[in-house]
Amino acid sequence: MAVEELQSIIKRCQILEEHDFKEEDFGLFQLAGQRCIEDGYINQLLEIIQDEKNKTIIKSMGWNLVGPVVRCLLRGREEDKREECFLIFDLLVKLCNPKELLLGLLELIEEPSGKQISQIILLLLQPLQTVIQKLPNNKAYSVGLALSTLWSQLSLLPVPHSEEQIQADDYGLCQCCKALIEFTKPFVEEVISDKENKENAKLKDELLKFCFKGLKCPLLTAQFLEQSEDVGNDPFRCFASEIIGFLSKIGHPVPQIILNHGRKKRTWDYLEFEEEEDKQLAESVASLTYLVFVQGIGIDQLPMVLSPSYLLQLNMEHIEVFLQRTEQSIYSKGLELLETSLLRLEDNSLCYQYLEIKSFLAVPQGLVKVMTLCPIETLRKKGLSMLQLFIDKLDSQGKYTLFRCLLNTSNHSGVEAFVIQNIKNQIDLSFKKTYNKWFAGAQLISLLDLVLSLPEGAETDLLQNSDRIMASLNLLRYLVIKDNEDDNQTGLWTELGKIENNFLKPLHIGLNMSKAHYEAEIKNSQQNNQVASMCKGVCSVTVGGEEIPSMPPEMQLKVLHSALFTFDLIESVLARVEELIEIKSKSTSEENVGIK
């Protein structure tokens, strides 16, 4: 029935000129052809399409059959039917109006979701390439439309991260990346072969957009296999190499992009790139920078005369982009790029003026976020080691400036303790090696004003700030032991009265208040233990106006005793510091009396 219906429509249209075909004819042709496929009359449909007398009809109306044929192929019919469907598809690509066929193919690419995205892309890429190459004009627009549609669909696929996931390629992204490169190659070659052609200049712009989109997705999040392994088996490395190769071929080599990024005058004239640079290009260029400096792809294109500090300056804004993201796969690349850039520098060689550049302060603050908020321990430790490496590379004034910045902005006791330990290390170097004005005298006293104080005086939450307080006390103990009152190299003894008023006395008061509070809570908890055990439930304890999360009574007691132990520890160090101050002051007084 469906075959007869289709033949009837064709017979009626054979006597008409192409421009006389009605909209109704198109609809009836599509409906009858679709029924032929659904009812299994694929061989008869193939014969109708192969008939030379139907060539004009197929040219005008045949593109309507592409959708049903493609869906038939994706359903996976028996082998002979599948082969006939492929023959029909090839004939439609060969005979149909390329403009209509292009739109039909792109609509089909936009339809699916999930794992079907890669299936249909892999099926349609080669026909899509053929159709575009047949277009008489506006090829640049068509290539851009196709690449944009393909990228939009591929960006929906999850990026595999582990070696096992890459090899399994469950969603087909790796296969699609490889196929997409093959799809793009002829158009790149077309740009190279005739650079003076105005249409090719537009085509170059579309290819440039595609390359930057590819650098953002999937390459921004993609993980790469170890370089010692067979690089040919790493689909993302191969994709990255091809993209960087395309950029060079169309006139935008790696040095031009990396060395000119961020300048007022761009290396390209395309308006969209000018307007969207900060939003769209930042992540793409960051991705490119990572590929070049960490993965070594295209690094041979860079001039060898660039200084390590200049390269660091180039990379810092890209590192900032990486660290602003919350995805582990992305900000871990920022850590790698930072490490690669810093290891090129000598210790203490990075001039303090670099901290006047926004990214040079934003990056260490980004590292603090990784150290304090990242759920993965290895990355937290990596962030800590990168912050230490960055500190090591700064000159003395740079270290001093960064310490002040971190103490004012980190709002994290552990980070502040880390900074205070670094301050102690710098003071120690000033004692043991060359006198350093930034960690002695007036400059150091200004820094100690930040360190040897309680954020909220006696009301400070000592438990929450225990890391910082212990580090501050240890620094003060070190200074008292190391610096004699007569020498007063650090300026400590001159400022001792202020330190006692701003730090030691409020700390005493805070400790007494905190210990009394926690001891009362322990007593209450112990009294309530019997009731809680009878109820076989959980109890709650309120500390500092905030309720400790529900937990068994035994666990709450452990938490309270642990807090009390922390206060005892702080108190013992505080007592030792005050004892040392008294001994040192008494010793100096006796010496002065002896001299008189």
From Swiss-Prot:
Chain residue ranges for the region called Alpha-helical region with structural similarity to HEAT repeats: 2-555
Residues bearing the modification N-acetylalanine: A2
KW DNA repair (keyword) present: no
Annotated knockout phenotype: Complete embryonic lethality. Embryos are present at the expected Mendelian rate at 10.5 dpc, but all are dead by 12.5 dpc. Mutant embryos display decreased growth, delayed neural tube closure, incomplete axial turning, pericardial effusion and a failure to form an organized, functional vascular network. Mutant embryos have reduced protein levels of FBXW7, RBX1, CUL1, CUL2, CUL3 and CUL4A, due to increased proteasome-mediated degradation, and increased levels of CCNE1 and MYC.
One family name in Pfam for this protein: Kinetochor_Ybp2
Domain of life of the organism encoding this protein: Eukaryota
Tagged with keyword Lipoprotein: no
Tissue specificity field: Ubiquitous. Detected in embryonic vasculature and embryonic perichondrium, and in adult eye, brain, heart, testis, kidney, smooth muscle and skeletal muscle.
Region Important for interaction with RBX1: start-end pairs: 299-596
Gene Ontology annotations for the cellular component aspect, listed alphabetically: Cul2-RING ubiquitin ligase complex; Cul3-RING ubiquitin ligase complex; Cul4A-RING E3 ubiquitin ligase complex; cullin-RING ubiquitin ligase complex
GO biological process terms, semicolon-separated: cell surface receptor signaling pathway; circulatory system development; epigenetic regulation of gene expression; muscle cell differentiation; negative regulation of cell population proliferation; negative regulation of T cell proliferation; neural tube closure; positive regulation of cytokine production
Protein modification: Phosphorylated on tyrosine residues.
Molecular function as annotated in GO: hepatocyte growth factor receptor binding; signaling receptor binding; ubiquitin protein ligase binding; ubiquitin-protein transferase inhibitor activity
Keywords: Acetylation, Phosphoprotein
Complex formation: Interacts with FKBP4 and FKBP1A. Interacts with RBX1 (via RING domain). Identified in complexes that contain RBX1 plus one of the cullins CUL1, CUL2, CUL3, and CUL4A. Identified in a SCF complex composed of CUL1, RBX1, SKP1, FBXW7 and GLMN. Component of a SCF-like complex consisting of CUL7, RBX1, SKP1, FBXW8 and GLMN. Interacts with unphosphorylated MET and is released upon MET phosphorylation.
Function: Regulatory component of cullin-RING-based SCF (SKP1-Cullin-F-box protein) E3 ubiquitin-protein ligase complexes. Inhibits E3 ubiquitin ligase activity by binding to the RING domain of RBX1 and inhibiting its interaction with the E2 ubiquitin-conjugating enzyme CDC34. Inhibits RBX1-mediated neddylation of CUL1. Required for normal stability and normal cellular levels of key components of SCF ubiquitin ligase complexes, including FBXW7, RBX1, CUL1, CUL2, CUL3, CUL4A, and thereby contributes to the regulation of CCNE1 and MYC levels. Essential for normal development of the vasculature.
Notes on the domains: The C-terminal half of the protein is important for interaction with RBX1.
PANTHER family linked: GLOMULIN
Protein name according to UniProt: Glomulin
Source species of the chain: Mus musculus
Gene: Glmn
